[in-house]
Amino acid sequence: MADLSSLKDLGTATEAAAPAHVRKVDSLGRSYATGKRKNAVARVWVKPGSGKIIVNGKEFAEYFARPVLQMILRQPIVAAARDGQFDIVATVAGGGLSGQAGAVRHGLSKALTYFEPGLRSVLKKGGFLTRDSRVVERKKYGKAKARRSFQFSKR
């Protein structure tokens, strides 16, 4: 490592060492990422196209029937102002529909940043690149649920 004699040298050395975000695209011109939420794991491929979104072989509006879930899935595209510019194919397994929608959203956000590194700051600011680590708390013995105690009778 270079001789660091001042704070200015330290600043330039750390800037040079910081990894630049590089575009990650496969031979077919697609970016791939995995997203997770609760117990759901989504594998997402993004490529330039007309704006089709396919989840587990179905149109996303058919797979996620509730409008709230559709909105959750489309949030990164809308935030990045790239509506109708990418074709998205996702396979998702595990968990329920809400967790699956969140997993696809997380994977889609990561895939968009791999395809177009300039979108990273916008998606990071929206909180789409952060893995939501909240999972169901385990049930404890001596309790009815995770925290709820059994009914107590004083007399």
From Swiss-Prot:
**Keyword Ribosomal protein tagged:** yes
Please name the InterPro entries in this protein's record. Answer: Ribosomal_Su5_D2-typ_SF, Ribosomal_uS9, Ribosomal_uS9_bac/plastid, Ribosomal_uS9_CS, Ribsml_uS5_D2-typ_fold_subgr
Record key words, sorted: Ribonucleoprotein, Ribosomal protein
Q: A single GO molecular function, which one?
A: RNA binding
Its domain of life?
Answer: Bacteria
Tell me which GO cellular component terms the UniProt record holds: cytosolic small ribosomal subunit
One Pfam family cited in the UniProt record for this chain: Ribosomal_S9
Q: In Gene Ontology terms, what is a biological process of this protein? A: translation
Decide whether keyword Ribosomal protein is in the record: yes
Q: Which NCBIfam families match?
A: PRK00132.1
Q: Into which family does the record put it?
A: Belongs to the universal ribosomal protein uS9 family.
Q: Kindly give the HAMAP family that the UniProt entry links to this protein.
A: Ribosomal_uS9_B
Q: Output this protein's name.
A: Small ribosomal subunit protein uS9
Taxonomic lineage of the native organism: Bacteria, Pseudomonadati, Pseudomonadota, Alphaproteobacteria, Hyphomicrobiales
Gene designation per UniProt: rpsI
